[in-house]
Amino acid sequence: MDEKTKIYDITIIGGGPVGLFAAFYAGMRNASVKIIESLPQLGGQLSTLYPEKYIYDIPGYPAVRAQELVNNLIQQMKPFDPTIALEEAVQSVEKQVDGTFEIITKKDTHYSKAVIITAGNGAFEPRRLDLPEAEQYEGKNIHYFINDLSRFSGRRVAVCGGGDSAVDWALMLEKVASSVAIVHRRNAFRAHEHSVNNLEKSSIAIKTPFIPTEVLGNGDKLTHITLQEVKGDTRETLEIDDFIINYGFVSSLGPIKNWGLELERNSIVVNSKMETSIPGIYCAGDICTYDGKVKLIATGFGEAPTAINNAMNFIDPKTRVQPMHSTSLFE
């Protein structure tokens, strides 16, 4: 059987942190594994949107850079040599007459005995700055993603937004930029209290409650932004080198909504086995929902083994759902 017709035990749709850990765990269960990822690299949103940001709620890490966490997860699964298909967006998943699944992407067709969906928040794109002239500076010095913190060294930076991402980026940029301002339309920030406390103690200029109303530049780069006080008359112009927009992201399930799965809003409904409404298809991570669900990477790390163990039992009912501990497997 060649690679194109090979039937894998487990195919994981989504190569973010939960998908990577699921691949490792499936390898420990001696499963043949394939990861299908729509982006050009593994890591999901951590690698694409926040590679330089620190994550503070991963067990065993007081703080870990997002890309470092991804690199460690890739290293962890490497001994099991999973097959990886990058830049392949899955269009459909259909159960065949023989009980296996046919997974069709824009590039290829894959086959699997069971499927684990770890697609995070689905397809996503940033909420953009809706101002005249802004679009021409996107990709120049208006940014929605930060891949390299060092590029802002010695520069004057303004960050717009009031959530965790905006506050975290402002605090990280303070260490490298010559000056940082954060602009938010409300007086109160929505970020974690600890981060807001650090922000208030920092040298960052806090511009609240203000919104950007105008961007000014020379056609090649943005040079100034005009701020307007919300429900007030105060106007202020900032001279800046970079403008970072953190208005959040718009996500959608994309083709997943057409796969016949039970959905609740933008999530896939699962039971205590992490099983969807279609037997043989399981979920883990932010893509799934159940009563009491908490959307954290750490939660997804716990859900992945549950999904894998039950998928293995689906493939072969003689297989134990509760496996040996990893300390025994690697001795």
Curated annotation (Swiss-Prot):
Keywords: FAD, Flavoprotein, NADP, Oxidoreductase. It is an enzyme of class 1 (oxidoreductase). FAD binds at E37, Q45, Y50, V90, F124, D286, T327. Pfam families: Pyr_redox_2. Its cofactor is FAD. Its EC number is 1.18.1.2. It catalyses: 2 reduced [2Fe-2S]-[ferredoxin] + NADP(+) + H(+) = 2 oxidized [2Fe-2S]-[ferredoxin] + NADPH. InterPro entries: FAD/NAD-bd_sf, FAD/NAD-binding_dom, Fd--NADP_Rdtase_type_2, Ferredoxin-NADP_redctase_2. GO terms for molecular function: ferredoxin-NADP+ reductase activity; flavin adenine dinucleotide binding; NADP binding. Binds 1 FAD per subunit. Belongs to the ferredoxin--NADP reductase type 2 family. Homodimer. This is Ferredoxin--NADP reductase 2. It comes from Listeria monocytogenes serotype 4b (strain F2365). The lineage of its organism: Bacteria, Bacillati, Bacillota, Bacilli, Bacillales.
